[in-house]
């Protein structure tokens, strides 16, 4: 799918709702979808899958599910955006960039650069590696949603 078609899907709240259920193990709920001339802001909420954290962290730090609030801000003119992820009830956050790059007349690639930071002495590295190891494939799966979606 080309960049204009991919951006049109991101601008469609129905696609974003569908995409939120597309990634196995990470169900996102659309909180808000704001579109103006050239800026799109998408806010989603989900729960961090317990398997994304090392076992020692699951038992030591987490007493209830970790809520994830994700904000995607897209500059539609540049086909580029930022991602911000806040983890609630866990000491961590993530942020990064996203870009839609044309690879042909009707094809494009959605790529992410994400930084994950855990604020836990001694365990931070293990948490960051574990979450990153799961987040990368989840974002890749969401990128695949662009070509898997069929307009209802």
What name fits each language-model region?
Residues 51-65, 117-137:
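Alpha-helical membrane-targeting segments
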Residues 40-42, 71-73, 79-133:
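Beta-strand/loop substructures that line and gate deep hydrophobic ligand-binding cavities in soluble
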Residues 1-52:
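Hydrophobic ligand-binding cavity/cleft-lining segments
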Residues 21-31, 67-71, 94-98:
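Short small/polar-residue motifs
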Residues 30-85:
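Glycine-rich portal/gate segments that line the openings of hydrophobic small-molecule binding cavities
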Residues 6-10, 112, 146:
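Hydrophobic pocket/interface hotspot
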Residues 68-71, 124-152:
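A conserved amphipathic terminal alpha-helix motif
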